[in-house]
Structure formats: C-alpha cells, structure tokens
C-alpha cells in the first residue's frame, strides 16, 4: 500500500504579518543556532532558531527575534552575506533585499546601535532574485524582468552588466569557483557566465516554459534543477544541455525550486497559490513520487536549513517548517 506523503508542518512560528519571503542564512555564522530572515509588507525580521533535531534539550523549535528592520515597502527577496558573524565583537548582521519599488537595499547591523542601509538603484523592472559573492561577500548579483543580470559592489556601483533575452528569474554563484555565475531566464535558457572574461561559457535548455526558478546544486555543481510550467527539471551539465529528468508536479504551475544544502538528491518545489492551497513538495531523485507534500493556504518563499533536511516556507502570519529524512 502506498504511504500517504501529506504532512502538516512539523513546527510553526507566529509572525505579525503575511510572510512574502524567508531565507535561512546559508553560511556559517559562528553560533550554534540558525539565523533566519523573513520579509513582510514593510519590514524584515532577523531571528534565531534552533530545532530539537540539533539540540536534544529543546522541544520542537526555539525561536527568538533578534531585530526588526523597517523597510517601508513590500520585501520580495532576501540574500544573506557571508560577512554575517555572530561570534565577532560586535556581531555583524549583513543581508540585502529586493523590493517592489525596484530597489536593492543593503542592510548592516551590530544588533545594537549601528543599523545602516544603502540603496542600490539601476533595475527598471521587477527584481526576481539576488545573491552575494559566497566567499568574501564584496559583490552581489541580481536579475530582473528588465532582461539584465547586474553585478554590484557594496558601494552600490555596477561592476558588470549582462543583457538577457528574456526576464532573469534566478541567479546563483558557484560556491568554490567564484568567477562562475549561473543565470536562469524565463524563456527556459540557463547560462553560465565567466565573470573574469564577462561572457557566457555554457548554456542549458528547458523544453518547458515559462521557467520560474532554477538552482545550482551546491553539493554537486554538475547538477542544476529548475521548475518550468508544471514540471521540475534536472540537468547534469557533464552529459547534455538538455534535461536528464523531468516530472510534472504542480497542477497550478510550479513556482520555486531549491536544492537541499546537505544532499545532491534532495530538493523542494512549491506551486502557485491556485484554486487549492499552495502546495509544497520535497522530492528525492531515487523516488518517483514526492517524499513529502505540505499544504499552505498562501505560501511564499522557500529555504533549506544549512545542516538539516528541514525546509521553511512563509505563510499567512506564520513561518512553517517541514522535516524529512535524507
């Protein structure tokens, strides 16, 4: 008998607003807890959470808000900087946001008196994704509906600018070879750029469109995953520029794709909030069906924990967390 994969969230945290985006800090911050940031209609909250899976004396989840940052406009995207450190004196919290007013804001805080932000302007349409340089964090990349990928330094100056053939949906930096950048376009093309030569070196093609989200697998950078139309799609760049595996998953169109940080076979997808609730699914490449299905009334955002097989999704006045096995 087939086991039902539908699960309620293992843990929830109440929030003061509808959560548009949520991001675990993917970098080591020097503290045993996990930094998490989420964005609402006009603010960003940075908090710390610890789960019973990592600390036996905790029951469920322990969550504490560290700081709320006024944002003044809806938060659409959040990216953590590797410069964030909780074990330094004073601590450093550094992240950037993309917003509905087409601006990027770079926030820096010591969680006490120093709270600064800088505005980066240049995109002429909606910003779909942004990411920091994963080593030094001295640059960030963004992609937009304005058919560009832009690289910025922390002063707000553009250091590179790539013209795309369609809206840029996702951007990822290679974790080790930091001169390589992946950009996914809505027309189904994923290109890899050499930032030293400032040119494309490789491209992948999806047969489905619109491509809404793509992600580079950090555990195995030969693997790229995406969602387009109703399907999830996996490429192995050593084999072909065409997909290795494709599977339909979300009836109301797929929305987001994220690889787990700890396994090259584990990934999560979300659907658009459609006629039913928005569906959240965890998939394992060894299984033909999703290994976990969750339902969120109005879900948005998707992020994996840095060291656990645990996913966060934003909801209506709450954060929801699902746990699976590897």
Curated annotation (Swiss-Prot):
Compartment(s) where it occurs, according to its Swiss-Prot or TrEMBL record: Chromosome, Centromere, Kinetochore; Nucleus, Nuclear pore complex
Keywords: Cell cycle, Cell division, Centromere, Chromosome, Chromosome partition, Kinetochore, Mitosis, mRNA transport, Nuclear pore complex, Nucleus, Protein transport, Repeat, Translocation, Transport, WD repeat
Keyword Methyltransferase tagged: no
Keyword Isomerase in record: no
Broad class of where this protein is predominantly found: nucleus
Gene: Nup37
BP term (GO), one: protein transport
SUPFAM superfamilies, alphabetized: WD40 repeat-like
Name this protein carries in UniProt: Nucleoporin Nup37
PROSITE patterns: WD_REPEATS_1, WD_REPEATS_2, WD_REPEATS_REGION
Job description of the protein: Component of the Nup107-160 subcomplex of the nuclear pore complex (NPC). The Nup107-160 subcomplex is required for the assembly of a functional NPC. The Nup107-160 subcomplex is also required for normal kinetochore microtubule attachment, mitotic progression and chromosome segregation.
GO CC aspect terms: kinetochore; nuclear envelope; nuclear pore; nuclear pore outer ring; nucleoplasm
Subunit note: Component of the Nup107-160 subcomplex of the nuclear pore complex (NPC). The Nup107-160 subcomplex includes NUP160, NUP133, NUP107, NUP98, NUP85, NUP43, NUP37, SEH1 and SEC13.
UniProt-listed SMART domains: WD40
Annotated WD repeat ranges: 70-117, 122-162, 164-203, 294-325
